[in-house]
Amino acid sequence: MAPSSNHKVVIVGAGPVGSLAALYAAARGDEVEVYELRGDLRDPSTIPLNFTKSINLALSERGINAMKHTRRDNMIQKILGEAIPVYGRMIHGRNDEKLWEASQAYDVHGRHINAADRCHLNNALLDELEQTPNVKLFFNHKLTGADFRAKKAWFEQRTPADNTSRAPEVEITFDYLVGADGAHSISRYHMMKYARVDYQQQYIDALWCEFHIPPTEEGEFRISPNHLHIWPGKEFMFIALPSADKSFTCTLFASTSYYTLLESSPESLLESFDKNFPGVCPDLITPADLQTQFETNPHLPLISIKCSPYHFGSSAVIVGDAAHAVVPFYGQGLNAGLEDIRVLFECLDQHGVYDLNASPESRALSRQAALQAYTDQRTKDAHAINDLSKDNYIEMRWGVQLPLYKLRKSLEETLDRYMPSLGWQTQYVRVSFSTQPYSEVIKAVERQGTLLLYGSISAIISSAAIVGVLAWNYPMRVSLLSMLQSPIQQLWSVWRNYHC
């Protein structure tokens, strides 16, 4: 453990992001207290905040890199040892009454994301915290108030079995508070009383419902475990991600009106799945189970949040979903939250917050500058992944089947494989297999798109010139013109529609 920093850090939220923040602070010698609204998250009876039992998440480079900075190799090995490597998408469909599937690799170099158990990840982080002497965990504590000028906060000590009497309240002091308490953050609510926060909340026109594909009778996976399975529809989609117990956790994403249609009768649900998600029912989920799961599991909205700034003075900062809830279509919500912690503590380190020779007043000023730097750096990147995640919903439910998507993916992967010095990569690779800032990812992808467009136009002009020369010099072979005209027109139409 590092020498005591004489900082007291209070973290609200003991989920993965809050737990990682506690490990970072503890490693720097801070006195850390973690307060969690729910009971001990390692207790199976603890109810998730979204009231579902969903256990799957996509853990990729950003999240793994952030955890590696804790230098707790055993913890990381424990987490990844239970994860399932996912190398790409498996697109499902049906033509002429025949089922088909097509694999789309994420990366030409064979890299993969990890389908990880959310509970297993959170438990591993909490176990590490419990073994860290300068960390205290407080479950069943609800944040009820905060004074970020006086650096005080108040929590109710809740007793799960007692819902009648008023919970006793405790007052605590801190040097700074980290709000990691999710999209409906109480920390953010209280911080907004002090900081002039621009806040934007959006519910997209989509609901989600969880389904479950069980293992076979022999205890094996029913479909490939190393893919994210997608049944795309133009306005909706059904996906499946593998779990360690050989089952799949599935999600139906669709508009409110589509859910209303499915709710109208049992026949509507079965007919819709047979038409739009071929091979799911009855092959993977029985009709009875499909109906039961649809009626039993909640139909939940998807929330997207942007706000700024992420801090107040030297005493408060929000991270993860509390700062930037994103829709789940890039699998980056948790990864972005974990990356927040790496960026936050890099800013604290760079501004000399942990200089033990500095006075408390000087360190407070340094911390204020560090939190401002964190806001400046992270806001643009969080807004970028927010936008990318929304756009990826369109790609997953529709774009993966378009010729343009396949053409651009093929071109970019070819350049990445055979001319790596150009630094050419697909958007997915930049997001999932690097730590390139999200805002820079958007700029790089736009630049690549522009170059590909100009390259295509040049190819069209060159082809037209060649055809013209041939037609002039070899009139008897003018049929070559009509032979090339159609594909040239198609290529131009695809690029024009894509960029308009």
Swiss-Prot record:
Pfam families: FAD_binding_3 (PF01494). GO terms for cellular component: mitochondrial outer membrane. L-kynurenine binds at residues 89, 106, 392, 428. It is found in: Mitochondrion outer membrane. Keywords: FAD, Flavoprotein, Glycoprotein, Membrane, Mitochondrion, Mitochondrion outer membrane, Monooxygenase, NADP, Oxidoreductase, Pyridine nucleotide biosynthesis, Transmembrane, Transmembrane helix. FAD binds at residues 17, 36-38, 58, 118, 143, 321, 332-335. The chain crosses the membrane at residues 451-471. Glycans are attached at residues 50, 163. GO terms for biological process: 'de novo' NAD biosynthetic process from L-tryptophan; anthranilate metabolic process; kynurenine metabolic process; L-tryptophan catabolic process; quinolinate biosynthetic process. It catalyses: L-kynurenine + NADPH + O2 + H(+) = 3-hydroxy-L-kynurenine + NADP(+) + H2O. Pathway: Secondary metabolite biosynthesis; Cofactor biosynthesis; NAD(+) biosynthesis; quinolinate from L-kynurenine: step 1/3. Its EC number is 1.14.13.9. Disulfide bonds: none annotated. Indoleamine 2,3-dioxygenase; part of the gene cluster that mediates the biosynthesis of aspcandine, a pyrrolobenzazepine alkaloid. Initially, the indoleamine 2,3-dioxygenase acdA accepts L-tryptophan and performs the oxidative opening of the indole ring to yield N'-formyl-L-kynurenine, which undergoes the spontaneous deformylation reaction to provide L-kynurenine. The kynurenine 3-monooxygenase acdD then hydroxylates L-kynurenine to afford 3-hydroxy-L-kynurenine. 3-hydroxy-L-kynurenine is activated by the A domain of the NRPS-PKS acdB and subsequently loaded onto the enzyme. This is Kynurenine 3-monooxygenase acdD.
